[in-house]
Amino acid sequence: MPGNSRRRGAVRKSGTKKGAGVGSGGQRRRGLEGRGPTPPAHLRPHHPAAKRARAQPRRPVKRADETETVLGRNPVLECLRAGVPATALYVALGTEADERLTECVARAADSGIAIVELLRADLDRMTANHLHQGIALQVPPYNYAHPDDLLAAALDQPPALLVALDNLSDPRNLGAIVRSVAAFGGHGVLIPQRRSASVTAVAWRTSAGAAARIPVARATNLTRTLKGWADRGVRVIGLDAGGGTALDDVDGTDSLVVVVGSEGKGLSRLVRQNCDEVVSIPMAAQAESLNASVAAGVVLAAIARQRRRPREPREQTQNRMI
């Protein structure tokens, strides 16, 4: 009987799939065994899709310290009102004027910013065809201070009060913290060079001009910089909801650096280990943790209140209670 494997001389073929291993269509199943799934077309070197992908020009990665271009009438006007340093204001020819555009041009002229009129097509190319509403503001890279210079300037006005940001990613939080540092008598802000928000036009606007007065320094290694500051007599206090020291028990009259963690993960392990103490803000039981910039403002306000009325030595306080 055809197909009967029990007949004399019959040989059972290996494999579970039906059909010939070699046949019309060039399947050759045995040759493909163990090679895994077929990769996507753009990853196969000789496929037309891969050739097209290689032919496309690669977009350069924007560095954080490059010149920034702010687009749109409202963002440009907010930057000019906040005193964000700028080098040029670009206005497309034929753009319909309104109150915002008129104010932008007037403020740029008053601030000595170059006003450049250009064709809309040229502005499209300059902004990579992003929506610009006929106006763009060129903002130069921020001039960061050196961590050693920042500390030296703070120690010249004792007691020093500095804020370090441990991988904070939102530039609006950075700007808000710079504003709080200026409001409560701080001397500067320290940020990591990598994986951190930088002083962009967004941070400038949020700081409401405080970024022009409060220096910001960048550290190649935040943990190492904090260790160096501690060796020079500055007490490092971390800010975390699970901290073992309540804010009410912190002596804010010493030279301090307040370390604020990132929005999601808080303080990193190495930074936390190098803090002299980790401080928490007492809150109502039903309240959740505070935003990073809000928490920094609360701590800075508490420290400023103590410095306006320095705490009495503990021995005097105990004697008065007796």
UniProtKB/Swiss-Prot annotation:
It holds the Pfam family SpoU_sub_bind. InterPro entries: Alpha/beta_knot_MTases, Ribosomal_eL30-like_sf, rRNA_MeTrfase_TrmH, SpoU_MeTrfase, SpoU_subst-bd, tRNA_m1G_MTases_N. GO terms for biological process: methylation; RNA processing. GO terms for molecular function: RNA binding; RNA methyltransferase activity. Its EC number is 2.1.1.-. Keywords: Methyltransferase, S-adenosyl-L-methionine, Transferase. GO terms for cellular component: cytosol. It is an enzyme of class 2 (transferase). S-adenosyl-L-methionine binds at residues 261, 281, 290. The keyword S-adenosyl-L-methionine applies. Disulfide bonds: none annotated. The keyword ATP-binding does not apply. Residues 1-69 are annotated as: Disordered. Residues 1-16, 43-61 have a biased composition (Basic residues). Belongs to the class IV-like SAM-binding methyltransferase superfamily. RNA methyltransferase TrmH family. This is Uncharacterized tRNA/rRNA methyltransferase BCG_3644c.
